[in-house]
């Protein structure tokens, strides 16, 4: 995959949307579901049970796309055994691979999970699960030193067996350098055009998440207004008795309703 066609990844969380997004190379069941679907204020509250539920829904909706399930906060950090056990849960739910955040610090976990036969996607740069501990949501790799650290992390993940690495909110020059330094594909999100592929959250692509809109996200179809308009139209037609109409209703056989209105 690296060096050939660009890789497209869409983060989505349910059966219906997965069926519509099946043309993407990969469907990422991100722990961002906690924010855009469950309304949490961060991804750290997402549980394994919730991730298994979302992963199962997406896997049932796809036909061709690879499904990658996110390991949520504290499902893999304590020990390699946890990482293997919880990765197995996501695979049983329907994932083809799992994703976890961190560089060299999680290399042992990556090695353990891949050793158990489960493909792993790495994730470096901005790490949403621990962003509060590292100064918040800031662009990574803006200095030469930090860019080189990212490259070291990427190489550690590759050596541990990761088949791809997400680069989140990494300065474009640094992301391009990291991409060239490893033999596995990099998937950028807010990291410029030099990565081997790109991932976006479906709700950002469709303008459906109202709390904030990341600078790196492009709205390909702003559906929030259309959804609100559809609900308003439904409400108005119900209140004015315009809905349901005859074509939306069912009727008894001829003669069976005689006398029922007395």
From Swiss-Prot:
It is found in: Cytoplasm. InterPro entries: Pantoate_hydroxy_MeTrfase (IPR003700), Pyrv/PenolPyrv_kinase-like_dom (IPR015813), Pyrv_kinase-like_dom_sf (IPR040442). Pathway: Cofactor biosynthesis; coenzyme A biosynthesis. It catalyses: 3-methyl-2-oxobutanoate + (6R)-5,10-methylene-5,6,7,8-tetrahydrofolate + H2O = 2-dehydropantoate + (6S)-5,6,7,8-tetrahydrofolate. Binds 1 Mg(2+) ion per subunit. The keyword Transferase applies. Its cofactor is Mg(2+). The keyword Magnesium applies. 3-methyl-2-oxobutanoate binds at residues 31-32, 70, 99. GO terms for biological process: coenzyme A biosynthetic process; pantothenate biosynthetic process. Mg(2+) binds at residues 31, 70, 101. Keywords: Coenzyme A biosynthesis, Cytoplasm, Magnesium, Metal-binding, Transferase. Its EC number is 2.1.2.11. Gene3D superfamilies: Phosphoenolpyruvate-binding domains. It comes from the Archaea. GO terms for molecular function: 3-methyl-2-oxobutanoate hydroxymethyltransferase activity; magnesium ion binding. The active site is at 168 (proton acceptor). One of its GO terms (cellular component) is cytoplasm. CDD domains: KPHMT-like. PANTHER family: 3-METHYL-2-OXOBUTANOATE HYDROXYMETHYLTRANSFERASE. Catalyzes the reversible reaction in which hydroxymethyl group from 5,10-methylenetetrahydrofolate is transferred onto alpha-ketoisovalerate to form ketopantoate. Belongs to the PanB family. Homodecamer; pentamer of dimers. This is 3-methyl-2-oxobutanoate hydroxymethyltransferase.
């Amino acid at each position: 995959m690296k060096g050939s066609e660009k890789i497209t990844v869409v983060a989505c969380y349910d059966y219906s949307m997965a069926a519509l997004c099946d043309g993407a190379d990969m469907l990422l069941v991100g722990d961002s579901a906690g924010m855009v679907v469950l309304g949490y204020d961060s991804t750290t509250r997402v549980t394994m049970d919730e991730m298994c539920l979302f992963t199962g829904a997406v896997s049932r909706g796809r036909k061709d796309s690879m499904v990658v399930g996110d390991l949520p906060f504290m499902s893999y950090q304590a020990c390699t055994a946890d990482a293997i056990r919880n990765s197995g849960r996501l695979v049983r739910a329907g994932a083809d691979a799992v994703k976890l955040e961190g560089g060299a610090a999680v290399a042992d976990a990556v090695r353990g999970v891949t050793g158990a036969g489960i493909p792993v996607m790495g994730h470096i740069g901005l790490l949403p699960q621990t962003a509060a501990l590292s100064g918040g949501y800031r662009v990574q790799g803006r200095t030469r030193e930090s860019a080189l650290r990212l490259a070291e992390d990427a190489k550690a993940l590759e050596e541990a067996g990761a088949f791809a690495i997400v680069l989140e909110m990494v300065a474009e020059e640094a992301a391009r350098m990291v991409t060239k330094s490893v033999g596995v594909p990099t998937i950028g999100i807010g990291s410029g055009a030099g990565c081997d592929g790109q991932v976006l959250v479906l709700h950002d692509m469709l303008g459906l998440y109202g709390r904030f809109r990341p600078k790196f996200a492009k709205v390909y179809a702003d559906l929030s207004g259309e959804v609100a308009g559809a609900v308003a139209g439904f409400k108005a037609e119900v209140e004015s008795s315009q809905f349901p109409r005859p074509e939306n209703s069912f009727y008894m056989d001829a003669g069976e309703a005689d006398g029922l209105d007395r």
